[in-house]
A protein has these predicted regions:
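The N-cap/first-turn positions of alpha helices
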Residues: 17-18
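Residues within the DNA-recognition helix of helix-turn-helix
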Residues: 49-52
C-alpha cells in the first residue's frame, strides 16, 4: 500500500544505528538493555535513538519532515 511505501522510504532516511535500534525494539521485541549490549552503546543512547526515530517517522509519514 501507499502507507507502507511511505514508511519504508522514511525508515531508509534513518541513520544506521537508529534504524538498527528501532528494528531490534519493535520487530525483535528486545529490551533497551539487550539492544544496548548488542550494539555496545549505553542504554540512554539507545532510548534516545528509538525516541527520536519514532518522532521522525511520525512526522515523515505525515509529510511534516
Amino acid at each position: 500500500s501507499e502507507e507502507v511505501l511511505k514508511l519504508e522510504e522514511c525508515i531508509s532516511q534513518l541513520q544506521q544505528n537508529s534504524k538498527d535500534a528501532v528494528f531490534m525494539a519493535y520487530y525483535n521485541e528486545m529490551t533497551y538493555e539487550n539492544i544496548s549490549k548488542a550494539v555496545g552503546f549505553p542504554v540512554n543512547t539507545v532510548k534516545t535513538w528509538v525516541r527520536r526515530s519514532k518522532d521522525f517517522l511520525n512526522r515523515c509519514v505525515r509529510g511534516l519532515h
